[in-house]
Amino acid sequence: YEAALVSNDVAVLDELFRNDRRTLRYGIGENLYGYDAITAFRAARSPVGLNRRTDKTTITTFGRDTAVASTLFYRESMPGRVGRQMQTWIRCPEGWRIVAAHVSIIDEPKGPAT
């Protein structure tokens, strides 16, 4: 996913989201409901400035067919801020797919991480 994201490989990103009207993605400035809305967003998104550094990536599994991927990310274009990303993945007949995603950016917390 990460390689496809930073290189703006729209075909791979589209494939990794579940093709279902119930799939959703809450982005930094948009709420996308359904696979069609997510793919339309990806098709229109600028490929500029997507590089980032990830940190504290955690994969939490629930049985063999459900996982949540959580990570922090940093971009040179947003000093003093930290991005947060969570994705719920399920194992489908065609492979692992994202069914829910959330991306947000906050001011970098001061002090030790908790």
Tell me the role of every PLM-derived stretch:
Residues 12, 24, 67-68, 97:
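General beta-strand recognition
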Residues 5-8, 30:
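Conserved short acidic donor-positioning loop in nucleotide-sugar-dependent glycosyltransferases
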Residues 82-112:
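Short beta-strand edge/turn micro-motifs at domain boundaries
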Residues 17, 29, 58, 72-73, ...:
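A mature extracytoplasmic/lumenal domain signature
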Residues 28, 36-81:
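Surface-exposed, charged secondary-structure patches
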Residues 2-3, 58:
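Amphipathic alpha-helical repeat scaffolds
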Residues 7-24:
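Short, well-ordered alpha-helical segments enriched in acidic and aromatic residues
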